[in-house]
Amino acid sequence: MPEVWQAVAQSTGLESLKKTTRDIPDYDELMKYRLAILDEHNITLPIIEAEIAKLKPLDGAVEFLAEAVKHFQIAIISDTFYEFAGPLMEKLGYPMLLCHTLEVKEDKIVGYNIRQPDPKRCSVKAFHDLKYRVFAAGDSFNDVSMLEEADHGFFFSAPQNVSELYPQYPLTRTYDELLAGLLAKL
């Protein structure tokens, strides 16, 4: 999924909104930072939704999912919000999405609700409790606990500072590499 916050930063000219968990690993700290910026600059949910509507899935994502679903059940476990994800999920064919919710009052984002602490690890644990083997891919610090919990974890287009700290996870740069890595673990 493309970075929603990067798109909003670009459209508003607010460089400060470009920060992601690659920059601020603590998601709660990052979201408080973002909400303060939104409030300070009076950026409302409709403004953000307008930018989200322009976003397209990452190049190759639709084709990757179409091929991957032939071999795996797919769940996207994301630190995004349902209020943001709809347009992109439609473009991806509505895969299962596990994410968070926003608190919105009069079109202003005033807060957010994290599904539970460490939701990515907990999601993988829940799939394990259901006796599923879990393969996971992520690109940032906030994905590491999910990769640790999964039967097999991969980095996908992770920045060097992240992948170097966790060399136990193969780094894939393309969807073809990721699919090949996943299929090799079947």
Residue ranges and their predicted role:
Residues 51-62, 77-79, 99-100, 112-118:
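Conserved beta-strand/loop elements of the cytosolic catalytic core of P-type E1-E2 ATPases, chiefly
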Residues 105-112, 163-170, 181-185:
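Short, charged, surface-exposed secondary-structure boundary motifs
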Residues 1-36:
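Active-site neighborhood of HAD-like aspartate-dependent phosphohydrolases
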Residues 98, 169-178:
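Short acidic-hydrophobic, aromatic-tinged amphipathic segments that line or gate anion-handling sites
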Residues 74, 78-79, 132-173:
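Acidic, Mg2+-coordinating phosphoryl-transfer loop and its flanking beta/alpha structural elements
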Residues 61-89, 96-100:
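Substrate-recognition element of Asp-dependent hydrolases with the DxDx(T/V) motif
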